[in-house]
């Protein structure tokens, strides 16, 4: 972990939470009146291309942000603190995990009868549980709104509905307000089907047979249909993967199609050569018959084999507007549902769920399926999938088509993480255009909604390849492409190459969405005025200041007050409790994800403190804010972030620790 070269006031210098909030409310009016509003420059005031180029060169050096001298603190270097790598690996685990015997049975907590009785793995001792349970954090929002709390005695905000060791309900409120239901909840029955390899994929099977695509054995529990064929599947998979890696499979299909246009090749892992020949003959007869009927007269093919086999063309699919849209990027870990709700309120047009691995989705992994959840406020919502196996991707697309409510599906071909690239997925796909073609054609064939793809400029910034790939994406089935203006190798060590993004927008036949280092509305105005970029995707800029969507739409810089920022943090906490739950696990998850967000948001420098416009790669110097709360929100210390979470989620234990999931301090020297 990088050393932090900034200082913040000690705990003794920071006032209590109550005092901070009270003082901030008193100063709220003055803060708002003094807010700096920057209007859009007129044509005559716009900078020349030479001035913009020189400014971009200066920005690329990664200098410190320019803050008014009266707010800058004296420089004091803090010694580098080494972080135990093993501790970081374990960070994702719940640090306050209880043993099963210490957890109260969910049914007992609601006043119901548990059918397992003494064999139940949870505790049934209510008095013992309540005696060891921490003091209630506050008022339960669910009980106040809906008249009941589904977490019962397990609720950590249960002071208003836990009476005499029982949970009560308010009959007057029940039914008055309809609970907002999260979309894309996959039922237990479907999860079991996925885990046991019993989920049906009829469209995928037909597509595989028609295109000679090998099918891998999906990991799952004991399944009688597949158990006897595991060895045969493994042997054939190894052979087919070699062909697939060398792109020989594509050539084979083309040669066979030239010899006979009506015969289709069937390649499976569970049939013998004899049955393969029989199926080929039957398939040929079916294809010829349907083609003859098609010529003779028109008929409805709904719910027939033809209907299942025939994929929709891009222009026949559901329409979603990718022109002049502000899109929240699919942010792993931090782009969770509560954060997306914040961004929707502040002006994001389109939101995308966190990256989900195709193989994990097909295995029915609960945590992976949770990444597909959608809040009703997300009126334009996409899911992003990542994988390198064509068969898994096509099946995953069919599953999404059947079970998930999404307006489009995005293919991740831009993730630079080694763990993903070593699997041949993410940014590694750009080195294999044939694989990208197979994925796009296969996935789009299973979906009635648009398919999009997110890519980088290439493996190396010195030899970008995106301009060669982009012209073909529309033909392969993509309805839009997002281009992140960085290479796989550089990560965040340099600014995004927007000149190259603009060049690629000239050769794209489909809407091109630009992504990389968007941090103020001026950048967006310049991009739209000087290129054919259709829309803008925002990632880290939204994490640091989610109100960037408001700034872009209103074409102004928002000098947001500290109390307004604290309100967004409070809203995130409430949204988190609503999404993850108000029991112990839910509170811990909400705190963890809130801390991950604060590891980015502390980098924000209020507009009123700046001498000039702040850019993404400019490091904030040590400074103090216009109030104690503003100073606290700018702290780089984890202990202060934890203190902020305690305002809404209650105190942590004395041994609680937190290590950020991502390295948000990406200000490396740009020279």
Curated annotation (Swiss-Prot):
A zinc finger (C3H1-type) spans 99-127, 134-164. SUPFAM superfamilies: FMN-linked oxidoreductases. InterPro entries: Aldolase_TIM (IPR013785), DUS-like_FMN-bd (IPR035587), tRNA_hU_synthase_CS (IPR018517), Znf_CCCH (IPR000571). SMART domains: ZnF_C3H1. Its EC number is 1.3.1.89, 1.3.1.-. Residues 39-60, 217-300 are annotated as: Disordered. Keywords: Flavoprotein, FMN, Metal-binding, mRNA processing, NAD, NADP, Oxidoreductase, Repeat, tRNA processing, Zinc, Zinc-finger. Residues 42-60, 248-257, 274-299 have a biased composition (Basic and acidic residues). PANTHER family: TRNA-DIHYDROURIDINE(47) SYNTHASE [NAD(P)(+)]-LIKE. Catalyzes the synthesis of dihydrouridine, a modified base found in the D-loop of most tRNAs. Specifically modifies U47 in cytoplasmic tRNAs. Catalyzes the synthesis of dihydrouridine in some mRNAs, thereby affecting their translation. This is tRNA-dihydrouridine(47) synthase [NAD(P)(+)]-like. It comes from Dictyostelium discoideum (Social amoeba). The lineage of its organism: Eukaryota, Amoebozoa, Evosea, Eumycetozoa, Dictyostelia. The gene is dus3l.
